[in-house]
């Protein structure tokens, strides 16, 4: 039997994702200052500026949105996941820096025109928390993590999750 390497499966999954339209970026190539943070700030801010160009969002306003997502607690898992799901499906209301402007309802994903979203696959994305985690492949939409792949060998009985 030929040896099986998880890295080969990881490469195959990434190739399939690229064929499906996902942009691939190795984690080492991402600008990240804080390894505890899982958002891709540049992708999120670029989406907001592009999608809501008519609102002329200020850097302070996009920072508020990013902070709202970044400060959702990871534990308890169900509560945090529910809060993120609500933001992704319902959007959020942004109070504008200029009080003369009305509040704006923003959606973090463009369901009407999916091609307006940024789909990014990242491998070996290191995250520091109570312990270090390095998922094999992480999928982001507009800089927001939405899917984790942890690829394991089906033939190695010693593998751990």
Could you say what each language-model-derived stretch is?
Residues 1-161:
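An alpha-helical interface "stripe"
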């Amino acid at each position: 039997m030929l040896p099986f390497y998880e890295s080969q499966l990881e490469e195959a999954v990434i190739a399939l994702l690229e064929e499906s339209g996902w942009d691939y970026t190795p984690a080492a190539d991402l600008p990240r200052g804080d390894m505890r943070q899982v958002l891709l700030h540049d992708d999120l801010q670029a989406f907001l500026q592009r999608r809501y160009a008519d609102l002329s969002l200020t850097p302070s306003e996009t920072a508020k949105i990013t902070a709202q997502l970044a400060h959702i607690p990871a534990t308890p898992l169900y509560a945090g996941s529910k809060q993120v799901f609500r933001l992704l499906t319902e959007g959020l209301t942004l109070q504008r820096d200029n009080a003369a402007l009305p509040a704006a309802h923003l959606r973090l994903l463009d369901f009407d025109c999916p091609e307006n979203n940024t789909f990014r696959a990242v491998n070996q994305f290191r995250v520091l928390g109570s312990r270090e985690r390095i998922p094999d492949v992480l999928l982001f939409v507009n800089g927001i993590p939405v899917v984790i792949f942890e690829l394991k060998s089906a033939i190695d009985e010693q593998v751990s999750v």
